[in-house]
Amino acid sequence: MSEQKDRAAQIAAYMASDGPLTPFHGEVPPAPKWFTRTVAVQPENAFVEVEAAKIHYLRWGDRSKPGLLLVHGNAAHAYWWSFIAPYLAQDYNVAALDFSGMGDSDWRKSYSAERFAEEEMAVCEAAGMFAVSEPPVIVAHSFGGFITMLTGAKYGDRLAGTVIVDSPVNPPGRPGGPPHRTFKPHNVYPDMAKALSRFRLMPPQGCKNLYIVDWVARHSLKQVEGGFTWKFDPFIWQDFSIGDTAARLRETKCRIAIFRGAESILMPPEIGEYMFNLLGRAAPVVTIPEARHHVMLDQPLAFVSALNALLADWNHSVPNRRI
């Protein structure tokens, strides 16, 4: 309990400090050419209805190619993948979704892991990923990885595989999960500069690629009366349960791989080893050097290279067994 209290105090201090974008006063940080080139690639913007909610997704590439669904984490959105997707779209029909209550998707009165899993499958369907001979792969970060563990357990017979990115399944007795949350409406900030100054990565971490932090922060905001506020529903987690992630991991019906950031506070080596054992020591655990929890933000090009290598292996080999 004291560890949870200490963590909550650390997060409170982190949230009270100046955000990493404060020194830019609303200006866009300088970015390398690879980044400006990839985000200039315009995806298809589309929606699919799932249980009376419009689910937004972005899509890149040729629909005749194998499908690759990219899934964001807690309170995030599809644009977390928009500087990654164009590299993958050379070989895949790539889509990135906004879960309900996040990004540009509709909010719901209540949320569940099962409904989020349905949203993943609905976007795969809408993006044409089940219209080709090869089933799709889902790549999912953080909270999205927990949902994709359920998707792999329930719908894995329709998937070629899942890649779980820094989504820790903790052994019994190890403290885990978020600290106590306060549920209240978002603040409204008078201008974009002030709103950007309040953006933080969670769990607390730095990121040297501030041009990426700025990109995802801008796409996290919407204009409302009086200024700008966050897009995600602040009440998503009020009655939400993630369920038994260890059981779902073991029940996966398709190929699976685990990615972790070498410097991630959520997935130290022993957690990767624990998940490796849960999967019968038959699924790869890939470590991205110099990356913290937000692997794609910290080391985007290394992440692309590692993912392409994994997918190339999956495309040219037959698993000894389904995990």
Positions of the model-derived regions?
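Conserved HGGG/HGGXW glycine-rich cap/lid loop of the alpha/beta-hydrolase fold
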Residues: 53-104
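Gly/Ala-rich beta-loop-alpha elbow adjacent to hydrolase catalytic centers
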Residues: 140, 144, 148
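Flexible "cap/lid" loop of the alpha/beta hydrolase fold
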Residues: 149-153, 159-192
